[in-house]
Amino acid sequence: MKPDAFIDELWSYAAEVPMEQHPWFDGIVKHRWTKEQIILGEVQHYLRVRTNPIFFGHMAINAVSAKEYTVMETVLENFMEELGGKRTHVDIMLQFLEEGGITREQADNAEPAPGTLAAIEMIIGCCQRRSALEGVAM
């Protein structure tokens, strides 16, 4: 499948369930989660987000190795969106956690839940061993 067709297919999946219908966000909006539960969930989110540079490194290597220069541009755009500029995804996560009373040190020392650890390992494995485009899709 051509990269553009694959990207279109992926966006069609993303459009099937609007973000506000995701169980996590739905629970926040409908006040099913307590403040403490939200903070604990966001600590887990932080533990995953802080590994984004690892994912992007593997994707960049795979794109260049395969001479997929348009995919490399997409990887670079994603990298800059996540890690460039004045406020990175990690910065935003840390601000949220600090407002909830969690320091960076506490977040960094938190134990990943089994699902968080599995997600991190799955994404790293995909980004290492699959195409750069499949890594971006993760």
Regions found by a protein language model. Give the residues of each.
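Phenylalanine-focused residue identity feature
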Residues: F6, F25, F55-F56, F79, ...
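Active-site-proximal alpha-helical scaffolds that flank and shape metal-associated catalytic sites
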Residues: S12, T70-M138
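Alpha-helical bundle segments that constitute or directly flank the non-heme di-iron/ferroxidase center
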Residues: Y13-M19, R32-S65, E81-G85, G135-M138
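Short, charged low-complexity linear motifs
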Residues: D26-W33, K67, R129-R130
